[in-house]
Amino acid sequence: MPLKHYLLLLVGCQAWGAGLAYHGCPSECTCSRASQVECTGARIVAVPTPLPWNAMSLQILNTHITELNESPFLNISALIALRIEKNELSRITPGAFRNLGSLRYLSLANNKLQVLPIGLFQGLDSLESLLLSSNQLLQIQPAHFSQCSNLKELQLHGNHLEYIPDGAFDHLVGLTKLNLGKNSLTHISPRVFQHLGNLQVLRLYENRLTDIPMGTFDGLVNLQELALQQNQIGLLSPGLFHNNHNLQRLYLSNNHISQLPPSVFMQLPQLNRLTLFGNSLKELSPGIFGPMPNLRELWLYDNHISSLPDNVFSNLRQLQVLILSRNQISFISPGAFNGLTELRELSLHTNALQDLDGNVFRMLANLQNISLQNNRLRQLPGNIFANVNGLMAIQLQNNQLENLPLGIFDHLGKLCELRLYDNPWRCDSDILPLRNWLLLNQPRLGTDTVPVCFSPANVRGQSLIIINVNVAVPSVHVPEVPSYPETPWYPDTPSYPDTTSVSSTTELTSPVEDYTDLTTIQVTDDRSVWGMTQAQSGLAIAAIVIGIVALACSLAACVGCCCCKKRSQAVLMQMKAPNEC
């Protein structure tokens, strides 16, 4: 048989097979060769028929179906996944899911269900995931789930539940994920979860819970995530989590917690994320956190904390992110951050800090980003960053800084982001070392806002980087010499140097210091080959050399910079919600 005949036969067989696959597909639906059926559209008001007998996945979405009658899926017993979402569904007849013994996934989310018939899920012996979220359910009863012994995931969030009766989940011994968030729960019985020994994720966020009784979580020995944020909890019982040794993520943010019992976090060796932001905490006592050797993130912003004592975080040896912004912190003890040798991100912005001890950050050898903006800092010790050699980003904007110590940033070779704007900089002769360092490291300041002078009044509003500072010199008679050329402004660059920049105190002499020295030396009439005095020639040469070096540094920053500018997604927050719905 010629080759073209084989090809025609092959095409014909494929077309015939495709016709079989699509046989029985309703006109309102689309059916694929992979036994997947999707029925969507407002024109659909009832379950389309006939459905393909071999369908394994059926989706009915965005229709005007208001009820499911008995046995609409009787002829598709091989169905494994059924999604009936975003419809007008308000009533389901018992027996609607009859003959679906192979069904493993059932979603009735985003409908208008208020009541679940008893026995609705009878016969669904293989069901593993049941999604009832975003409906209008008013109550659940133990009989609703008594036939779902294989269930692993139950989603009930986004309903109108006010109470969970004892025994509601007693038959769900294999359940690993339970979501009860976004309801109207005001109270949880200490016995409601006692048979859920395999549960790994429990979410109770965005309810109206005011307290959690002792023993509520005692039976949840395998729990890994507990979400209690956005409730009205005012007090935590000391032993509330003492039996949850496998807990990894604990969300307690946006409640009314005003104090933490001394032993509340003592039995959580696996915890790696703890959120307490948006509460009413006023103080943190030493040892309150720990021992938690695996904690990586601690979120404490938006509280009323006023001070940080010594060793308050000393048990958190692996902590990498510490967020203390938007509190009322006015004092930090020199040993407050003892033990935080692995910390990468420290946020202290928007507090009431006026002064910092020179040793307060000495233990933070691995710190990369520090946020100190929106405080009242008047000065910084010269050794404030002495042991923090890996800093990449420093936020100091919107403080009360008038100057900074000589060489404060010289050793920070990895620094790629420095924010100094919105400070009342005093642009007199004392500002020259800082001005010269900024001139040589201008790309690190960013392109949005640069620091400007606040005083004296005659230079207010002028850029600190390009300002000409009049240096007072001894009163001696000197011939007229050209004024020192204005420091050139170099274009900003999005890149940042990845090696230590030349500072004003090391390899390059301060240009204004040269100017001062030259004007105090007795000047002769000897002229150079350019027709200048020696002082004029030296001044011109110094200006040219400094300009070339500054330009070279700026160009090197443009070409060679690959400094990491990574910013923790926790500080930008945003101050956004830390766990999924």
Curated annotation (Swiss-Prot):
Domain (LRRCT) ranges: 423-475
GO BP, one annotated term: positive regulation of cell migration
Primary location group: membrane
Topology class, membrane: Single-pass type I membrane protein
Domain LRRNT: start-end pairs: 22-53
Regions crossing the membrane: 539-559
Cytoplasmic side: 560-581
GO cellular component, one term: extracellular matrix
Positions of LRR repeats: 54-75, 78-99, 102-123, 126-147, 150-171, 174-195, 198-219, 222-243, 246-267, 270-291, 294-315, 318-339, 342-363, 366-387, 390-411
Extracellular side: 22-538
UniProt GO molecular function: collagen binding; fibronectin binding; laminin binding; protein sequestering activity
Record localization: Cell membrane
Annotated segments matching region Disordered: 489-509
Glycosylation (residues): N75, N369
Compositionally skewed regions (Low complexity) per UniProt: 499-509
Keyword Membrane: yes
Key words, A-Z: Cell membrane, Glycoprotein, Leucine-rich repeat, Membrane, Repeat, Signal, Transmembrane, Transmembrane helix
Signal peptide positions (record): 1-21
KW Transmembrane (keyword) present: yes
Function: (Microbial infection) Modulates the ability of SARS-CoV-2 to infect host cells through interaction with the spike protein. Does not act as a SARS-CoV-2 entry receptor but sequesters virions and antagonizes in trans SARS-CoV-2 infection of ACE2(+) cells when expressed on nearby cells.
Record note on quaternary structure: (Microbial infection) Interacts with human coronavirus SARS-CoV-2 spike protein (via RBD domain); the interaction is direct and sequesters virions at the cell surface.
Record's protein name: Leucine-rich repeat-containing protein 15
Species lineage: Eukaryota, Metazoa, Chordata, Craniata, Vertebrata
